[in-house]
Each structure stands twice: as C-alpha cells, then as structure tokens.
UniProtKB/Swiss-Prot annotation:
Name of the protein described by the UniProt record: Large ribosomal subunit protein bL19
GO MF annotation list: structural constituent of ribosome
Coiled coil: none
Role played: This protein is located at the 30S-50S ribosomal subunit interface and may play a role in the structure and function of the aminoacyl-tRNA binding site.
Record-linked PANTHER family: LARGE RIBOSOMAL SUBUNIT PROTEIN BL19M, RIBOSOMAL PROTEIN L19
C-alpha cells in the first residue's frame, strides 16, 4: 500500500523549482484568482525557513512591506506556484532564520555568498 502512495506522490513532485536555501532571496510568482480572472502575483523576500518532506515540502519567505514585516508560507510543489526565481544567494549559518523577525533596517541584511 505504501508503495502506491509513494509512487503517486513521486508523480506530483515538481522539477522546475530551482535549488535554493535559507538566506537566499527569491521571487515567487503565485497564481491568484480574483473573480473570474487569474493573474500572477509576485512575492519577493528572504527564505527564512525550509521544510523538506517530499510532496509536503514548504518554505517561508519574509519581506518588509511599508515598514511592516510580512511572511508567507508556500508549499513547494503546489500548482498555485507559477515559478520560483532565485535572485541572490545568502551566506548564513543557521537552518531557521527566525531571528530576523527581531531585527530591522540594516541589521536584518544578509551577507551575499560569493562562490
């Protein structure tokens, strides 16, 4: 029984999502349906958390909008996500960057990773 479930989940995994990590700046294009129209809405920010659970994987993106911190959790393999674009690689030493919630301004910046 579990083999059937694994096979069905494997078919639904997306392969068009780029490899990104915590600290990276990404732009997520989300399909939004308003009334009868569908449009794309961009959400750009820093990935502060990533949860790898196969089909149930998720990541949290944080941005500052009008001086207010906004966080949004996206399901990695959701059909509502049109695309994920990697803007900038960040150099961090933590798996979860929840400490950024308490920082503001220049203190909340993340060093860029130079390969």
């Amino acid at each position: 029984m579990s083999n059937i479930i694994k096979q069905l989940e494997q078919e639904q995994l997306r392969t068009d999502i780029p490899a990104f990590a915590q600290g990276d700046t990404v732009r997520v294009q989300v399909r939004v349906i308003e009334g009868g129209k569908e449009r794309l809405q961009a959400f750009e920010g820093i990935v502060i958390a990533k949860r790898n659970r196969g089909l149930h994987s998720a990541f949290t993106v944080r941005k500052i909008s009008n001086g207010e911190g906004v966080e949004r959790v996206f399901q990695t393999h959701s059909p509502l996500i049109a695309s994920v674009e990697l803007k900038r690689r960040g150099d961090v030493r933590r798996a979860k960057l929840y400490y950024l919630r308490n920082l503001s301004g220049k203190a909340a910046r993340i060093k860029e990773k130079l390969n």
